[in-house]
């Protein structure tokens, strides 16, 4: 089964709100591996949205979706969405 990745870009408007999000969201991420958290991503082509980028790895697309759509994470996501303008995608690994 191919791994899946969640990539989220965030243009942070409320740092305190994002800090609260981080506390709540971290409690939901047992099934994820944090691969990257970058506040200074180097744009090598085109334009990039956001002041920080997060890349999470999951064992499968199903695991990524189960985490993202869970009641626990959706409660946390509301905090993130209130504190930042965000974009997110699920990427499908090879394999």
Give the role of each language-model region.
Residues 61-89:
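C-terminal structural segments of small proteins and small subunits
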Residues 1-52, 59-69, 92-95:
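Short S/T/G/P-rich N-terminal loop/turn motif that feeds into the first structured element of a domain
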Residues 52-54, 86-87:
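Generic beta-strand structural signal
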């Amino acid at each position: 089964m191919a791994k899946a990745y969640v990539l989220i870009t965030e243009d942070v408007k409320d740092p305190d709100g994002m800090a609260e999000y981080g506390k709540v969201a971290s409690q939901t991420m047992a099934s994820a591996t944090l691969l990257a958290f970058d506040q200074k991503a180097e744009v090598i082509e085109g334009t990039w949205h956001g002041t920080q980028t997060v890349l999470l790895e999951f064992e499968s697309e199903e695991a990524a979706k189960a985490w993202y759509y869970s009641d626990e994470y959706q409660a946390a996501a509301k905090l993130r969405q209130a504190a930042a303008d965000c974009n997110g995608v699920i990427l499908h690994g090879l394999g």
